[in-house]
Amino acid sequence: MLETITSVNGVVNGIVWGPVGLALLFGTGFVMSVRTGFFQFGHFRYWLRNTIGAIFTDRDITAHTEKNDKAISQFQSLCTALAATIGTGNIVGVATAILSGGPGAIFWMWAMAILGMMTNYSENVLGIFYRRKNADGEWSGGAMYYLADGLGGKKGCKKLGRVLAVLFACFCVLASFGIGNMSQINSIAGNMNAAFQVPNLLTGILLAVLSALVILGGLKRVAAVTEKIVPLMALFYILGALTVVLTHVTAIPAAFAAIFKGAFAMQAAGGGVLGYGVSRAITWGFKRGAFSNEAGLGSSVMVHASSNVKEPVQQGMWGIFEVFADTIVVCTLTALVILTSGFVDLNTGRMLTEVQGSALVGEAFSTVFGSFGPKFIAVSILLFAYSTVLGWSHYGTKAFEYLFGTKASMGYKVVFVAMVLVGATMKLDLAWDLSDTFNGLMMLPNLIGVLSLSGTVAAITRNYVDRKFHGKQVEPMWSAFAEYQKEEEAEEATLDKAANE
């Protein structure tokens, strides 16, 4: 039975993460970039200023909503999304990309991220535009909703949209137990045991208790925790990585040269031959880029849709920043730590060590921090992976809610917390492989939805640009549903009146 599951999983994984799936992912990013006028480049300063740049100047970005308001702040939605996105892939995934595809894989990781910015942007725009309020008055949005109401609203596509929405939700629930829970906890337990000799069972018990205290409290409690953890863990890792890279500052030019040479087959990947090397660099760069920032999976939109924002484009810009922070900043720093620490021959791209995964990154940190290097990585993985569990708990909850209703979601949360203990104490090689596949299966219906609604994304973007950049007096496109559009307009009119008094 186990062999059959492994065999079937291998075939499906080869399709969703093979040339077809990766081409669809890359193509969607390119199409959405074209349809939005390459918004990520043309309005770079604008989206940077109105996202991370506004945190200290615009109280609306960080202000907590009132107790009876089920929405969360824009900053909380970013932190919860980044909590789920910045995980072991930013450490282990980058090391795997370099080991398997050579330094050139990093270039293609960047390429995927640059286009992925607009895929993530589009998901968030559609997430806000098609979101609805559930029985508890909480915003519910995500790929399920824009597949069912957006794609399903097109002529002759009603049944297709609903079927794809259900499939997406099912795959999301299954993925949440794997990549969003057990696999992450397993990484934490293994690294804590290796670095600090903490028993796996003890790690599992402690994390299960902490998870119960946070996750069972609902989205607001999850968001309240992630908005504190994410900035601290990012600062902790970035400062540590910068210390290593700047200590080896003379190797930085050679590291970038190796990345560009490897990307275009001017050197072999992992001891391979020229030509074959560039194919591996592209494949591993694309795969690890997708795993790292999750653009195209339709996952983070489920928390972004809960934000107290009216403008779909505003939340879309947070999606751009999310990919930028995850891949362009954090993953690049991990790559430079490895490439500047002497474990890769920068002239040939060949590995000079047989150490792999997080151990490779730990060894790279050890060149500066000595025996504390592996401990630094263990703590980083603890923070990164545990925050991923918190973020994915919300994704799974929303998908389960879509399938079975709001009242059933508490049952899902209880099972999710119980799986933390399972993840800490069991060998999970197959779980990693299965969760990998379920992520890919989430991606396919989501990208079909994004591409089919590309015209809607383009129209919403034009509407925003016309109003904000050109001062045109046109009706805003805030919601696909008249009742929510009127509700938002009435609230905006009240705020304008109060501001003018």
Where are these regions (language model features)?
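Membrane-interface alpha-helices at helix entry/exit sites of multi-pass transporters
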Residues: 62, 67-71, 102-111, 149, ...
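Helix-loop-helix module between adjacent transmembrane segments
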Residues: 32-33, 112-137, 148-186, 190-214, ...
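Membrane-interface loop-to-helix entry segments
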Residues: 24-49, 164, 168, 185-192, ...
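Alpha-helical membrane segments and immediately flanking helix-loop junctions
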Residues: 59-98, 126-129, 135-151, 173, ...
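N-terminal alpha-helical transmembrane segments of multi-pass membrane transport
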Residues: 1-84, 88, 98-105, 116, ...
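Transmembrane helix-loop junctions in multi-pass membrane proteins
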Residues: 4-5, 35-40, 89-94, 176-189, ...
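Flexible loop linkers connecting adjacent transmembrane helices
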Residues: 38-72, 96-98, 102-106, 110, ...
